[in-house]
Amino acid sequence: MPIKPVGWICGQVLKNFSGRIEGIQKAIMDLVDEFKDEFPTILRLSQSNQKREPAQKTSKIRMAIALAKINRATLIRGLNSISRSSKSVAKLLHPQLACRLLELRDISGRLLREVNAPRQPLYNIQVRKGSLFEIISFPAKTALTSIIYASYAALIYLAVCVNAVLKKVKNIFQEEESIRQNREESENCRKAFSEPVLSEPMFAEGEIKAKPYRSLPEKPDISDYPKLLANKQSNNIQVLHSVFDQSAEMNEQI
């Protein structure tokens, strides 16, 4: 059954009572008029019980007179409409109430089971009877485990040391390789500067013209030959010195 909202229920109740509110209001006003004069007497009778029975008789008589004056058909219709609306409201609310009651019953049952369940300790203490062999072997086991842990620590330390040594050796080899490469480069530079560079001819081949034949020169004087050799050697030494100076400057710049 679908659950109806509260606004719809209130609307249905007002709709059922819309045609009968005037009759019920009139009946209530008549009852109030009849009992209006009796309110002070009722208060006095509550304080003293001497005139209790006559007051009850008069109130009953007046109530009967008021009920006789009220239109019975209107009152009955109003009561019937109230009963029908209350039944419809009860039918609408019955499934919700049943579901809530079932949920409450399940929750209460679960709580009762949890409360009545035997409480277990947080940890179970197991008592074991130790044998003589276990008592004797316990120190040996402890020493063996300590030795194993120490060996593990030594192996780790040895691995760290070996890695450090290998790193240093690698750095040394790299430095030697760099020094060797620098030496090879410097030697190549020296060789390049020491070799003479031939200059290209200043004029084209077409511009060279053959000269007319001349007679051979006379026999040169051999006495000037040692001087020429000495000048040539001094020129060669100056060229070598200049080449070495240039190579040294290039090495310093590198």
UniProtKB/Swiss-Prot annotation:
One term under GO cellular component: membrane
GO terms classed as biological process: cell differentiation; spermatogenesis
Q: Which domain of life is it from?
A: Eukaryota
Which cysteine pairs make disulfide bonds? none
Tissue specificity as recorded in UniProt: Highly expressed in testes and pancreas. Low levels found in the heart, lungs, and brain. Very low expression detected in the placenta. No expression seen in skeletal muscle, liver, kidney, thymus, small intestine, colons, spleen, leukocytes, prostate gland, and ovary. In the adult testes, expression was about 6.44-fold higher than in the embryo testes. No expression in testes of patients with Sertoli-cell-only syndrome. In patients with arrest at spermatogonium and primary spermatocyte stages, no expression was detected.
Q: Where are the transmembrane segments?
A: 143-165
Give the keywords, sorted. Answer: Developmental protein, Differentiation, Membrane, Spermatogenesis, Transmembrane, Transmembrane helix
What membrane topology term does the record carry? Single-pass membrane protein
Q: Where in the cell is it found?
A: Membrane
One Pfam family from the record? SPATA9
PANTHER family, alphabetically?
A: SPERMATOGENESIS-ASSOCIATED PROTEIN 9
Name the job this protein performs.
Answer: May play a role in testicular development/spermatogenesis and may be an important factor in male infertility.
Q: What name appears for this protein in its UniProt entry?
A: Spermatogenesis-associated protein 9
Give the source lineage, highest ranks first: Eukaryota, Metazoa, Chordata, Craniata, Vertebrata
Q: Which gene encodes it?
A: SPATA9
